[in-house]
């Protein structure tokens, strides 16, 4: 279960990482919300449209760039699905 201490550690980690922009933060918070709604299971399914709506993004290119960078920086593992009928999966790194 996420405690206030865990949330504080996550927040400080993201805020103190100068490589991340507000867009990265917005996407990560959307993913954290979806992870929580999925009963905190890793990995969890997600759709681009849902994450973009939650993070208030309109550019698919920006979404993919930031998602790739979050993976490169060690915040997530992203496993894309190239099928219209199967959702991509996300694994949040070092969450608990």
Predicted regions: what they are:
Residues 36-96:
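Winged helix-turn-helix DNA-binding recognition segment
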């Amino acid at each position: 279960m996420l405690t206030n201490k865990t949330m504080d550690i996550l927040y400080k980690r993201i805020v103190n990482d100068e490589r991340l922009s507000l867009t990265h933060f917005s996407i990560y918070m959307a993913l954290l919300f979806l992870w929580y709604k999925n009963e905190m299971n890793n990995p969890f399914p997600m759709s681009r449209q849902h994450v973009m709506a939650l993070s208030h993004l309109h550019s698919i290119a920006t979404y993919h760039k930031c998602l790739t960078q979050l993976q490169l920086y060690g915040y997530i593992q992203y496993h894309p699905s190239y099928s219209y009928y199967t959702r991509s999966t996300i694994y949040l790194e070092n969450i608990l």
